[in-house]
């Protein structure tokens, strides 16, 4: 199983479909939502493998479960929540960061 950590970004709906097409039934997507807003502007995928949660909520911890059980942990945007999550991982966990243009432009230009 692959754990994907995502934010409400325009490219994520397409990304979810691509991963599920390439590796069906082997993906769990966490979409971080703003606790004040409780909904997304861009991602509207209604599938059992897509979860909309606030980081560190009880629901988040239950959905993620045992991090050592994942074949891959894939970061789709390096935000505050994903950084905090990475700091909690035990040694030896493989993490892949898929960088996209928005991250580069926002942080380095």
Positions of PLM-derived features:
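Short beta->alpha connector loops
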Residues: 8-12, 56-57, 77-81
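Conserved nucleotide-sugar phosphate-binding/catalytic loop shared by glycosyltransferases and other
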Residues: 31-32, 36-60, 64
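Short N-terminal targeting/anchoring amphipathic segment
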Residues: 63-82, 94-98
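Short His-Asn-centered micro-motif
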Residues: 5-7, 33-34, 75-78, 99-100
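Acceptor-binding helix/loop patch of EC 2.4 sugar-transfer enzymes
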Residues: 101-109
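Short, conserved loop/helix-junction motifs that constitute active-site signature segments
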Residues: 22-25, 87-93
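N-terminal subdomain of nucleotide-sugar transferases
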Residues: 1-44, 70
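Short glycine-/acidic-enriched loop or helix-start segments at secondary-structure transitions
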Residues: 14-16, 83-87, 107-108
């Amino acid at each position: 199983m692959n754990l994907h950590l995502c934010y409400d970004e325009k490219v994520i709906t397409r990304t979810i479909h691509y991963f599920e097409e390439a590796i069906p039934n082997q993906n769990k997507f966490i979409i971080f939502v703003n606790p004040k807003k409780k909904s997304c502007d861009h991602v509207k995928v209604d599938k059992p493998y897509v979860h909309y949660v606030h980081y560190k909520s009880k629901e988040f911890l239950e959905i993620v479960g045992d991090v050592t059980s994942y074949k891959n942990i894939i970061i789709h945007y390096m935000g505050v929540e994903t950084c905090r999550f990475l700091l909690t991982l035990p040694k030896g966990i493989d993490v892949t960061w898929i960088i996209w243009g928005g991250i580069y432009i926002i942080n380095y230009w």
